[in-house]
Amino acid sequence: MAGTRTSRRAVPVAVLASIVLIAALAGCDSYFFYPSKDHFPNPALDCVAREDVFVRTPDGVRLHGWVLRPKGEPLGTILFLHGNAENVSTHVNSVVWLALAGYRVVLVDYRGYGKSEGKATMAGVHADALAAIDSVFAMDGVDKDRVAVLGQSLGGAVAIYAVANSPHKDRIRALVVDSAFSGYREIAREKVGEISVLKLFRSPLSRLVTDRYSPSLWIGRVAPVPIFIVHGDADRVVPPAHGERLYALAAEPKMLCIVPGAGHIQAFASPAMRARVLRFLADALSTKRHLGTELP
C-alpha cells in the first residue's frame, strides 16, 4: 500500500514539474535571469577605488553600475558583463584583480538587477549590453583605442552579441568570454534533459526559447576583434563543449584555453590563468596584433 501511495503522489508531482517548466520556458526570461535587488557587503571592494556609474538605455531604463579605478594611469578600460544571478556587488569578485593589475573596469547591472531599473527580459538585457558599450565610449578620460569587453557565463553570451552588433566594434580591441554557453536553446535543451520526467520532451520544449541572441549565431561576426575563449574542463553548469563549439565557430583572430580542474566561472581563480588573460589584453590593447592561436 505504501508503494501505491507513493506512485499516486509521484504522478501529480511530475505533472506539476512539467507545467512549471513549460511555463518557465514559455516565458524564457524567467528561466535565464535570477537577479537580486539587494547589494551584499563585499570586503574585496576595500582594496580598490570605485564610483557609481549610470547608463540610460534607448528605451529609457536607467542602469546602475560601478567603475573600478586602478592606481595611476589605466592600461585600458574593460567593460564587464556578469552572469545571470545576483548583481555587481557579488560579481565584482571576478574582476577586482583586473583593477589591481592596472585596468579601469566598468561593471553595469542589467535591468532588474541591483539598483538598475526595470525587469530583466531577453531583449532588454541584450539592449543593456549595447548601451553599456556606448556609455564606455562616451566616458571622459577613457582612451577609446584601449577598450575591451569581458563576459562571464550569461554575460559571455550577451557580450558576443553586443560586440558583434555594436557601432563601436571597430574600436573594441579585445573580447574575453568565460564559461559561456553556445546557444540559449541548446543550454535549455540540456537542462530540460536533466529532469527525468521531461527528458523525452527536451527538444520540443527547448523550442519555446528564442535563439535570436544565441552566441553561436553571432560569434562569427565578432571579427576582427580578437577573442579569447576560456572554459573550465570541470564546468558542470555549462559543459566545456560549449566553449569548444564557440571557438570552432569564431573567426580569426581567436584563442581558446580549456582550464584543467576549473568549474563554472572559476578559471580566473588561477594566477596562471590571470597571467594569460593579462598577456592577451596587453597584446590586443597595445599592438593590436592578431593572435590566431590556441593555448594549451
What does each model-found stretch correspond to?
Residues 23-56, 64, 291:
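An N-terminal hydrophobic leader/cap segment in hydrolases
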Residues 97-117:
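Conserved alpha/beta-hydrolase
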Residues 120-140:
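Alpha/beta-hydrolase active-site loop
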Residues 236-242:
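Conserved alpha/beta-hydrolase "acid-adjacent" motif
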Residues 84-97, 110:
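The serine-hydrolase catalytic nucleophile loop
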